[in-house]
């Protein structure tokens, strides 16, 4: 598929960087032949066609498959950041001179940044998009030609209406430039006709103005001479009046200075007094703080003294208690010592008794042994052994019974003693526990009272601190309120003075001409001749402050024009002025005055500096509309002079234009401007300022009353706060005393409860010991009772046996009975002594145990006595230290009281001095207020004189453009009456002249000159109109001829291409209206092989697509493009049609350079160079190229 070296190479290369998926810079080198770009779906191959379309000037983001132009910039990927710019360049071969540039190579570049800024370049030089369009015009290339054809273009051809399809023929016929020239010519023709109509209207208007204006100019020249003389006379009059006012002001200045000096001295003196008062108040506050601190110190010392006294009282009570305890323990010790002595003596007596009983028992036992020996001998003799045995056993049993009875009696006695002691201890313990419970309850109550009092003290302390803070805050608020009230009073005085000055000016109608002033004053007095007057324009309108200057300048002297209900009322007012020689005035009768507003040109109304028609920017009663429209209806208001010149130009210099700063552009183009010397309030602003001042003064007075009420309320609050603070401090002091008493009670109760608790513990211990001893005795008693019962039974049995035996042996010998009796008595006596001995031993053991216990108790009491004596001695030793502390605290307390009394005396002296100073300061204030009132009255007069001076000076400046110094040069030897008489003569002459148009002097020659100029322009425009109509007719003829030629050529080519693409068949283009070649539509008739002729819309999808492609190829044949980009236009074709499509474009590549974007195999097979677009990296396209020559392939990465 190699091509000859003579094949055209128009588009040499393409560079793309940052455009859509081409993040990195890539370059496509386009050689001869057919180049095909291939790649998988989504790889970005169609972005190449978008890049070419974009650089050729595509402005629709939708056509580039985006929502906004910034979407063409690479937006980043998962691994790459977005770039800030997209740039595409096309390199063209211009060796054939297809472009009208003196370069062999032409580079077209387009660049866009992320902020939306775009740039175009031709050979690296910045240019306009229009320059690029003109460069490609009628070259066959370009965005609107056939150099870029996508699948969408095929669909577009298929869906175009017949009227729209003719544009394809027009492009191929090369009449686009004629169509553009015709549009420009029609636009110019429309503008020319519009200008011509406007000039005709202006000329007609001027023709009606020239005659009257010439007459007005003659009158105006005479009026100018009279006005000049009148001006000089009025200047002299104003200067005369100002001289008198100046003299008054000079005198006023001297008096003001004297009053100000006196006020300054009074202020200084008052300031010094107030400074002294403030210093004394500061000292008083410091004294209050010192007194408060001293009170706190005194209170703390009182507390300390109370605590020491309380401690001393507690110690005295403790010492008394210890004395009582010592006495009690001493008594108990003596009792225990007596018990020990008695126990010792009893023990000694018992031991002696024990020894005696032991000796007697031994003697009895010896006697008993002898008697038993003799009895045994007797029994042996008498056989009474058994009786003796029984009697011995009985005796032994009886002895045991006696012992058991004695022991039981002892146990019973001891138990009775223990029970009595236990009952006494139980009662004593109950009494002690009841006393302990009572003390504990009392202590708990005291603790609760302490807690409540402490909480109350904390609450009172917090309330006291809060009261201190609130009182201090209220004092600060009071001081701040006084300062604000003083500032408010000063501001109110200033505003009130300004208000009264302006009100006086308004009431006296200062600023108005004499005639206007006299008429309005007469109307106020209900003068019959003035009953028809409505008021001046200044009185009848309201305007926002920002428009005041503009409206005042727009009205000029007309601001003093008087509106009347009827023309008759105006004439009556004129007669009144003449009859009383009161000057002149201008009237606007509502029944004859003509209103109307200027029509604002559309271009002028759309100007950003245009604000509106002057009459629309003011507010007035509807009945006065015609009056205001007559003065302001033809005046436009704009922001500044630049806007004024633009609006004047847009409105053809027919309207009067005023800026917000007062500069003017007059009809015809003349300008008036400069600085405005506006001193004080003007007529428009004065009423507004009076209203504002009245409102501000009312607001200040309301604020004054509110602040005075607030100050009174604060004073009441401060007084209540101080009373509350005093009350709280008293309560706090009472609470501190009550707390000291409660704490003393708590300590006493705690000490007594501790003592009782110790006694209860000791009683409980004794009771436990008694209970244990009683349990043991009861156990022994139970055993003894059981043994006694057994012994009684045994004795009874022994007695019965003995009785039986005795009954048997009653007849024994009398010797044996006597012996037995004596033996029995001896045994009984021996048993008795033995029992006594045993009891003595037991009693001795008990007494020894009791003696040990008494000795132990004696030692413990001695130890308690020693501890008590040591405690008492320690208390006695510490008593002196506490007495010393009490004396020292009492001295400190006395000193603190003395300091507090001294501080209070000093405060009383300082308070009296402060009251005297405040009384003197009040007198100084009254003196100052008297001086300030005098100064205020003088300032009011001065303000009135200043207003008169300002009015006169402003009149000099605004009416005569003179300063006071310059006006003094006009003074002559004539007095004021002579000057006034001459002014009246001039005014009479001016009345005879009637209305004077001063501007006519300058306007007439200018209007004549403008009339001549516009007449010449009218002639030129008529000639231009005729020339443009002739040009349009020639362009229509040329376009019709060229369209017809192009249609025939495209139709013939279409027939041929259709047959080649379909391998037969027939197709043609038909005109919908052959008689109207400029607007006729174009229909496509096709007859594929084997089918009948039918419209394009009736064919199958593949046939319609191939037919549309055939039409595109026919257009290319008629008007070949140096290069052509085809973006997947064969996508809907089958393989056979794709092959025919590829073969056909291969043949066309002899005259046209093709770059085809495709994924069809047949197209790729026909390619000379293949470019592969891949996306190895997500979201980033990469370019590969393959040069095909036979079977050799050279692959490289671009």
UniProtKB/Swiss-Prot annotation:
Residues engaged in binding ATP: 40-47
GO CC annotation terms, alphabetical: chromosome; cytoplasm
Biased composition (Basic and acidic residues): 803-818
Keywords in alphabetical order: ATP-binding, Coiled coil, Cytoplasm, DNA-binding, Nucleotide-binding
Molecular functions (GO terms): ATP binding; ATP hydrolysis activity; DNA binding
Gene3D superfamilies per the UniProt record, alphabetical: 1.20.1060.20, 3.30.70.1620, P-loop containing nucleotide triphosphate hydrolases
Annotated stretches, region: Disordered: 785-818
Location (main, coarse): cytoplasm
Stretches assigned to the SMC hinge domain: 534-647
CDD domains: ABC_SMC_barmotin (cd03278)
Subcellular location: Cytoplasm
Coiled-coil regions, chain positions: 175-211, 322-524, 687-1042
Biological process according to GO: chromosome condensation; chromosome segregation; DNA replication; sister chromatid cohesion
HAMAP family reported in the protein's UniProt record: Smc_prok (MF_01894)
Subunit and interaction comment: Homodimer.
Family: Belongs to the SMC family.
Function as written in the Swiss-Prot or TrEMBL entry: Required for chromosome condensation and partitioning.
NCBIfam families per record: SMC_prok_B
Comment field on protein domains: Contains large globular domains required for ATP hydrolysis at each terminus and a third globular domain forming a flexible SMC hinge near the middle of the molecule. These domains are separated by coiled-coil structures.
Protein name per UniProt: Chromosome partition protein Smc
Origin species: Desulfitobacterium hafniense (strain Y51)
Gene name tied to this protein: smc
């Amino acid at each position: 598929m190699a091509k000859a070296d003579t094949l055209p190479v128009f588009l040499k290369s393409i560079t793309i960087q940052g455009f859509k998926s081409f993040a990195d810079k890539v370059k496509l080198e386009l050689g001869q032949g057919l180049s095909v770009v291939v790649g998988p779906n989504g790889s970005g191959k169609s972005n190449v066609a978008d890049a070419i379309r974009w650089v050729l000037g595509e402005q629709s983001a939708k056509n580039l498959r985006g929502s906004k132009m910034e979407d063409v910039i690479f937006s980043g990927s998962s691994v790459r950041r977005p770039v800030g710019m997209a740039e595409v360049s096309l390199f063209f071969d211009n060796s054939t001179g297809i472009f009208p540039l003196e370069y062999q190579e032409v580079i077209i570049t387009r660049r866009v940044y992320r902020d939306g800024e775009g740039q175009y370049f031709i050979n690296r030089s910045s240019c306009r998009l229009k320059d690029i369009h003109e460069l490609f015009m009628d070259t066959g290339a370009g965005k609107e030609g056939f150099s870029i054809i996508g699948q969408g273009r095929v669909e577009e051809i298929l869906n175009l209406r017949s009227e729209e399809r003719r544009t394809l023929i027009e492009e191929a016929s090369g009449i686009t430039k004629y169509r553009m020239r015709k549009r420009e010519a029609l636009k110019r023709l429309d503008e020319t006709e519009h200008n011509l109509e406007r000039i005709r209207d202006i000329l007609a208007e001027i023709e009606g103005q020239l005659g009257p204006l010439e007459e007005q100019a003659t009158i105006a020249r005479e009026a100018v001479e009279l006005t000049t003389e009148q001006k000089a006379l009025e200047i002299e009059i104003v200067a005369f009046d100002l001289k008198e006012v100046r003299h008054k002001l000079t005198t006023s200045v001297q008096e003001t200075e004297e009053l100000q000096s006196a006020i300054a001295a009074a202020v200084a003196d008052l300031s010094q007094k107030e400074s002294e008062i403030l210093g004394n108040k500061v000292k008083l506050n410091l004294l209050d703080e010192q007194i408060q601190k001293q009170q706190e110190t005194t209170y703390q010392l009182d507390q300390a003294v109370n605590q020491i006294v309380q401690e001393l009282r507690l110690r005295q009570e403790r010492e008394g208690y210890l004395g009582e305890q010592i006495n009690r323990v001493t008594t108990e010790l003596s009792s225990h010592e007596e018990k020990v002595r008695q126990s010792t003596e009893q023990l000694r007596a018992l031991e002696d008794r024990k020894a005696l009983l032991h000796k007697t028992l031994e003697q009895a036992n010896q006697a008993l042994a002898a008697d038993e020996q003799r009895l045994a001998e007797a029994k042996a003799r008498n056989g009474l052994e058994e009786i003796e045995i029984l009697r011995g056993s009985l005796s032994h049993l009886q002895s045991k019974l006696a012992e058991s009875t004695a022991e039981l009696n002892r146990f019973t006695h001891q138990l009775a003693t223990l029970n009595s002691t236990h009952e006494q201890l139980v009662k004593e313990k109950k009494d002690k526990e009841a006393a302990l419970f009572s003390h504990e309850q009392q202590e708990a109550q005291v603790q609760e009272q302490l807690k409540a009092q402490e909480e109350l003290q904390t609450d009172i302390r917090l309330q006291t601190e809060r009261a201190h803070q609130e009182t201090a805050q209220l004092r600060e608020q009071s001081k701040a309120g006084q300062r604000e009230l003083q500032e408010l009073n000063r501001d109110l005085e200033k505003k009130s003075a300004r208000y009264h000055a302006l009100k006086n000016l308004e009431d006296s109608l200062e600023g108005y001409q004499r005639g206007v002033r006299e008429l309005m004053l007469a109307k106020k007095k209900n003068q019959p001749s003035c009953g028809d007057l409505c008021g001046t324009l200044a009185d009848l309108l309201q305007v926002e402050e920002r428009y005041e200057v503009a409206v005042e300048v727009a009205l000029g002297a007309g601001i003093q024009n008087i509106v009347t209900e009827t023309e008759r009322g105006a004439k009556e007012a004129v007669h009144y002025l003449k009859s009383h020689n009161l000057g002149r005035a201008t009237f606007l009768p509502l029944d004859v005055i003509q209103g109307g507003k200027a029509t604002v040109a559309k271009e002028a109304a759309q100007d950003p500096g245009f604000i509106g028609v002057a009459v629309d920017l003011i507010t007035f009663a509807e009945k006065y509309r015609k009056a205001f429209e007559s003065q302001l209806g033809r005046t436009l208001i704009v922001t500044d002079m630049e806007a004024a010149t633009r609006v004047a130009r847009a409105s053809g210099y027919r309207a009067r234009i005023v800026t917000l700063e007062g500069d003017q552009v007059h009809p015809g183009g003349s300008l008036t401007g400069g600085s405005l010397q506006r001193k004080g309030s003007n007529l428009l602003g004065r009423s507004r300022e009076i209203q504002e001042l009245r409102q501000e003064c009312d607001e200040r007075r309301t604020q004054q009353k509110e602040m005075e009420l607030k100050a009174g309320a604060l004073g009441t609050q401060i007084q209540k706060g101080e009373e509350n603070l005093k009350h709280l401090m008293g309560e706090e002091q009472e609470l501190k005393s009550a707390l000291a008493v409660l704490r003393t009670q708590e300590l006493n109760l705690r000490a007594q409860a501790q003592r009782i608790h110790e006694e209860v513990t000791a009683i409980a211990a004794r009771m436990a010991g008694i209970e244990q001893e009683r349990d043991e005795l009861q156990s022994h008693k139970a055993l003894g009772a059981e043994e006694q019962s057994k012994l009684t039974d045994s004795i009874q049995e022994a007695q019965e046996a003995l009785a039986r035996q005795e009954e048997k042996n009653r007849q024994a010998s009398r010797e044996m009975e006597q012996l037995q009796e004596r033996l029995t008595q001896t045994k009984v006596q021996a048993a008795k002594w033995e029992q006594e001995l045993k009891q003595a031993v037991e009693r001795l053991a008990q007494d020894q145990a009791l003696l040990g216990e008494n000795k132990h108790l004696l030692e413990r009491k001695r130890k308690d006595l020693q501890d008590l004596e040591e405690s008492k001695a320690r208390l006695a030793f510490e008593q002196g230290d506490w007495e010393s502390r009490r004396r020292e605290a009492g001295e400190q307390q006395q000193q603190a009281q003395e300091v507090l009394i001294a501080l209070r005396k000093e405060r009383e002296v300082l308070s009296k001095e402060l009251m005297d100073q405040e009384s003197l300061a009040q007198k100084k204030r009254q003196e100052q207020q008297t001086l300030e009132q005098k100064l205020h009255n003088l300032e009011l007069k001065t303000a009135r004189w200043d207003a008169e001076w300002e009015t006169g000076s402003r009149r000099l400046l605004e009416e005569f453009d003179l300063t006071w110094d310059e006006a003094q040069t006009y003074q002559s030897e004539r007095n004021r009456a002579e000057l006034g008489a001459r002014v009246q003569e001039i005014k009479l002459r001016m009345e005879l002249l009637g209305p004077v148009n001063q501007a006519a002097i300058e306007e007439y020659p200018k209007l004549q000159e403008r009339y001549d100029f516009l007449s010449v322009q009218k002639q030129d425009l008529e000639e231009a109109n005729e020339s443009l109509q002739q040009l349009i007719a020639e362009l229509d003829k040329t376009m019709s001829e060229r369209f017809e030629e192009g249609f025939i050529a495209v139709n013939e080519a279409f027939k041929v291409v259709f047959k080649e693409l379909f391998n037969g068949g027939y197709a043609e283009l038909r005109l919908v209206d052959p008689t109207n070649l400029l607007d006729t539509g174009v229909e496509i008739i096709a007859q594929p092989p084997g089918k009948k002729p039918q419209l394009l819309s009736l064919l199958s999808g593949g046939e319609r697509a191939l037919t549309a492609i055939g039409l595109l190829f026919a257009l290319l044949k008629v008007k070949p493009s140096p290069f052509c980009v085809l973006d997947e236009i064969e996508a809907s074709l089958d393989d056979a049609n794709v092959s025919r499509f590829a073969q056909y474009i291969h043949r066309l590549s002899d005259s046209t350079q093709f770059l085809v974007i495709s994924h069809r195999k047949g197209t790729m097979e026909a390619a000379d160079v293949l470019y592969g677009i891949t996306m190895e990296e997500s979201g980033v396209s990469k370019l590969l190229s393959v040069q095909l020559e036979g079977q050799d392939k050279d692959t490289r990465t671009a």
